[in-house]
Curated annotation (Swiss-Prot):
EC supergroup of this enzyme: transferase
Catalytic activity: [HPr protein]-L-serine + ATP = [HPr protein]-O-phospho-L-serine + ADP + H(+); [HPr protein]-O-phospho-L-serine + phosphate + H(+) = [HPr protein]-L-serine + diphosphate
Enzyme Commission no: 2.7.11.-, 2.7.4.-
Job description of the protein: Catalyzes the ATP- as well as the pyrophosphate-dependent phosphorylation of a specific serine residue in HPr, a phosphocarrier protein of the phosphoenolpyruvate-dependent sugar phosphotransferase system (PTS). HprK/P also catalyzes the pyrophosphate-producing, inorganic phosphate-dependent dephosphorylation (phosphorolysis) of seryl-phosphorylated HPr (P-Ser-HPr).
Region of interest: Important for the catalytic mechanism of dephosphorylation: 265-270
UniProtKB keywords: ATP-binding, Carbohydrate metabolism, Kinase, Magnesium, Metal-binding, Multifunctional enzyme, Nucleotide-binding, Serine/threonine-protein kinase, Transferase
Family: Belongs to the HPrK/P family.
Residues holding ATP: G154, D155, S156, G157, V158, G159, K160, S161
Protein name as annotated: HPr kinase/phosphorylase
Length: 320
């Protein structure tokens, strides 16, 4: 996973215009934080975040106009540091001539957009947060089952890829097979994708490598998906106790995000695709407020109470 993004990539993804410095678009962006210079236009550079993208909007350029030419020249030269990746000017504003010269001397590109500062700030931050997030590679298969991202894990040879292939055949979509790159979009959202070299591919023992998009169409694949549920496949053994009521509430923490987890015993004759499909549908029902285990417990307690009351009445009748 790269820990930087080039200015060229930012231009392409966020649709920025290159106003100046086309030869310098390979400069590296190493942080998703974006600076809107304010104190710098007052001459205070003690804590200047030079490694960030510098965003100038109506407020910043208007304030700069009230400065003298010498002040603008001094401050904008100081803002053009070797580690500064680029400047972005919003709302189709003109480039201050002092910045134009300082950026050219420092070989820093200046980009522009018709969007407001708030809009372009949001767009750039969202892209950079996703691109620069620390990533972890997991062994497993990621499938989207009716809108629920399910990460299937388990020992090698337990049948993860074969089960995922059956799920794809049933109309669900593959994101990654064998290796899943995951990153935390925020504290509650874990996203998975496939390494570039493995996109759309699956390895099936006895057959080899297959291209899912070629065999089943582009509707059978997705580039990435939120991981909402982990299904861990375990070889069944008599001495291992598995959850039969679904009230255990197991979870697994990945990249700081807590994800619900269910363990499914693998045994000859079990249709794992249908079981995992049901697990995903059950998870979706729970997120909508329905809990089958809770309903079962409530109905069972009601039945026990009714039987107890009936037995109590029968005992009283016998006594009379």
């Amino acid at each position: 996973m790269p820990n930087n993004v080039t200015v060229q990539e930012l231009v392409d993804k966020v649709r920025l215009k290159v106003l100046q410095g086309e030869d310098y678009l390979q400069r590296k962006i190493t942080t998703s934080d974006i600076s809107r210079p304010a104190l710098e236009f007052a001459g205070y550079f003690k804590h200047y975040p030079a490694a960030r993208i510098q965003l100038l909007g109506i407020t910043e350029t208007s304030f700069a106009k009230d400065l003298t030419h010498e002040q603008r020249e001094e401050y904008m030269t100081k803002m053009c540091m070797p580690q500064t990746p680029c400047f972005v000017i919003s709302t189709n504003l003109p480039i201050p001539k002092e910045l134009k010269k300082a950026a050219e001397d420092a070989k820093i590109p200046i980009l522009g957009t018709h969007l407001t500062s708030s809009q372009i700030l949001s767009n750039m931050t969202s892209y950079l947060l996703e691109r620069l997030a620390p990533r972890k590679s997991l062994h497993g298969v990621l499938v989207d089952i009716s809108g629920v991202g399910v990460l299937i894990t388990g020992d090698s040879g337990v049948g993860k890829s074969e089960t995922a292939l059956e799920l794809v055949r049933r109309g669900h979509r593959l994101i990654a097979d064998d290796r899943v790159e995951v990153y935390a979009r925020d504290e509650q959202t874990l996203v998975g994708t496939a390494p570039q070299i493995l996109k759309h591919l699956m390895e099936i023992r006895g057959i080899g490598i297959i291209d899912v998009s070629t065999l089943y169409g582009t509707g059978a694949i997705m580039p990435s998906d939120q991981i909402s549920l982990i299904v861990h496949l375990e070889t069944w053994t008599p001495d291992v106790q598995f959850d039969r009521l679904g009230d255990r509430g197991d979870t697994q923490t990945i990249q700081g995000v807590i994800v619900p987890k269910v363990s499914v015993p693998v045994k000859t004759g079990r249709n794992l695709a249908i079981i995992i499909e049901s697990a995903a549908m059950n998870y979706r029902a729970e997120t909508m407020g329905y809990d089958a285990t809770e309903t079962f417990d409530r109905n069972l307690n009601q039945l026990i109470k009714q039987n107890s009351e009936r037995d109590s009445k029968n005992n009283k009748g016998s006594a009379n």
